[in-house]
C-alpha cells in the first residue's frame, strides 16, 4: 500500500503539488491523469524519492519513506520511463539484469529471471538477449524497459508515461500486454499519462489532477458516470462517454453461451471474450452483422453477442 498524506512539492515560489491525499491499495493500478504541468509526474517521482516532498508524509506499507535508505527504496520499486532509459552499450539481457546484479543475486538465478521475463513479454531470449537497444524496435525496447523494472520482483511498479512516444498500434499492443501481465504478477502500480483513454483502459482507480491537486479519485466507471467537476467532464469528453463506458466492459459480460464449442472458420468475423463491447458494436456496424461469434483463448467458440443485447443492456 502507498499512502500520500497532505503531500506538497514546491520549486521556489511555484507549487507543483498542493496537499495531495491519496491511498493506493496493494495490487491495484492507480493512474494519475491530467494535462501537462498538473503535477502527476512530480507526484510519481516523490514516491521513490527521486524528488523530495516539501511537506506531508509518504508511507509505503505503513513506513515513512524518509526513514528508508533512498537507494534501497528505489531498488525495491520498478521504474519505467518514456523512452525506456536503457543503457545503449549493454545488451538486452544485461539491461534487464541490472537490479538483480546490484542485489548480488547468483548468476544462475539472474539468467533464469531474464529468460522468464523476456518470455513473459513476448521477446524470444534466443533472438533478442544478445542484441543492443539500438537494434530493437520502439515496442521491443519498451518491453525491455518493463522487463528491467520487473526483474527483481518488486512489490511496486512506477510508470511515467511509458508508452507516450510510441505509435498508436504499438501503444495499444503494449497496453494489452500490461493488462495481461498485471493479471499474472499483481503489482501495486502507479501509472502516469495525459491520455484519458489509456487511463480508462489500464486503471483500477484513476486520480485526476489539476493545478497540483487531486480533484477526483475513483473507478473508471464512476468517473465516467459521475464526473466531479467541469474539468473532469471536459477531460473525459462530453460526447462519447457512452462509448467509453462500452470500452470498460468485456464481451463475455453480454454474450449468450454455447454448449458446443467449435473452431473459427477462415475469414469469419470473430471476437475474443476479453474484447470490449465497444469493439463488438463497431464490428457489427462496420460489417452489417446482427451478431458475432465469441471465442476463448484456446480458439474455441464459447458464445455469441448480438446487437440487440447490447442495445437492450444500454451499457
Regions found by a protein language model. Give the residues of each.
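Short helical segment in ABC ATPase nucleotide-binding domains corresponding to the A-loop/adjacent helical element
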Residues: 92-101, 111, 115
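Conserved ABC ATPase "signature" region
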Residues: 108-127
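ABC ATPase "signature
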Residues: 217-218, 226, 304
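ABC ATPase NBD coupling module
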Residues: 64-78, 102
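Helix-to-loop junction immediately C-terminal to a conserved catalytic motif
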Residues: 48
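Conserved signature/switch motifs of ABC ATPase nucleotide-binding domains
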Residues: 131-134, 152
Amino acid at each position: 500500500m502507498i499512502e500520500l498524506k497532505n503531500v506538497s512539492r514546491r520549486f521556489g515560489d511555484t507549487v507543483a503539488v498542493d496537499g495531495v491525499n491519496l491511498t493506493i491499495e496493494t495490487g491495484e493500478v492507480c493512474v494519475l491523469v491530467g494535462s501537462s504541468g498538473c503535477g502527476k509526474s512530480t507526484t510519481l517521482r516523490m514516491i521513490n524519492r527521486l524528488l523530495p516532498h516539501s511537506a506531508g508524509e509518504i508511507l509505503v506499507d505503513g513506513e515513512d519513506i524518509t526513514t528508508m535508505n533512498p537507494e534501497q527504496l528505489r531498488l525495491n520499486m520498478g521504474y519505467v520511463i518514456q523512452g525506456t532509459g536503457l543503457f545503449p552499450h549493454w545488451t538486452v539481457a544485461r539491461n534487464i539484469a541490472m537490479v538483480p546484479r546490484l542485489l548480488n543475486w547468483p548468476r544462475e538465478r539472474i539468467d533464469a529471471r531474464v529468460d522468464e521475463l523476456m518470455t513473459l513479454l513476448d521477446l524470444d531470449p534466443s533472438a533478442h538477449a544478445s542484441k543492443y537497444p539500438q537494434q530493437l524496435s520502439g515496442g521491443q525496447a519498451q518491453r525491455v524497459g518493463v522487463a528491467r523494472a520487473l526483474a527483481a520482483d518488486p512489490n511496486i511498479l512506477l510508470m511515467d508515461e511509458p508508452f507516450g512516444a510510441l505509435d498508436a498500434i504499438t501503444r495499444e499492443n503494449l497496453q494489452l500486454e500490461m493488462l495481461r501481465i498485471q493479471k499474472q504478477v499483481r503489482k501495486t502500480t502507479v501509472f502516469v499519462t495525459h491520455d484519458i483513454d489509456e487511463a480508462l483502459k489500464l486503471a483500477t482507480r484513476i486520480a485526476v489532477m489539476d493545478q497540483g491537486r487531486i480533484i477526483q479519485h475513483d473507478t473508471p466507471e464512476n468517473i465516467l458516470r459521475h464526473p466531479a467537476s467541469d474539468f473532469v467532464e471536459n477531460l473525459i469528453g462530453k460526447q462519447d462517454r457512452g462509448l467509453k463506458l462500452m470500452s470498460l466492459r468485456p464481451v463475455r459480460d453480454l454474450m449468450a453461451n454455447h454448449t458446443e464449442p467449435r473452431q473459427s472458420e477462415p475469414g469469419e468475423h470473430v471476437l475474443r471474450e476479453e474484447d470490449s463491447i465497444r469493439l463488438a458494436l463497431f464490428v457489427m456496424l462496420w460489417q452489417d452483422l446482427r451478431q458475432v461469434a465469441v471465442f476463448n483463448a484456446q480458439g474455441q467458440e464459447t458464445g455469441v453477442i448480438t446487437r440487440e443485447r447490447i442495445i437492450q443492456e444500454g451499457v
